[in-house]
Design a protein with these regions (language model features):
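N-terminal first-folded block
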Residues: 3, 8-34
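Phosphoinositide-binding peripheral membrane targeting modules
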Residues: 22-59
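Acidic, Ser/Thr- and proline-rich intrinsically disordered linker/docking segments
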Residues: 2-11, 44, 50-92
Length: 92
């Protein structure tokens, strides 16, 4: 089944190598399907997701919040989450 929408988000890892701190950013995706939302570490049935919200930060970043049956999952994103939220709410 093809995803309705895929929202990229930033995963940040900090490492210390040879007495130097390095920050490594990788891109992950939150995939929205008709019946579920998939993240790299979880799969949520649409009925287990109560809401999806966001909050803008400085420097063009934004927090995307998945309010789920097991708690709130937070993702840092660089692009607008408006289309992801719109598609999610159209399923509810």
């Amino acid at each position: 089944m093809k995803a309705i929408y895929s929202q990229p988000f930033m995963q940040t890892e900090r490492r210390i190598e040879e007495e130097t701190q390095k920050t490594i950013e990788t891109v992950g995706y939150i995939h929205l399907y008709n019946d579920r939302i998939e993240t790299p570490s979880n799969v949520f049935v649409i009925g287990d997701v109560f809401d999806v919200t966001s909050r803008s930060l400085s420097a063009g970043y934004c927090f995307l919040y998945l309010h789920t049956i097991i708690g709130v999952r937070t993702f840092v994103i660089k692009s607008s989450p408006d289309r992801f939220i719109f598609h999610y709410r159209s399923l509810k």
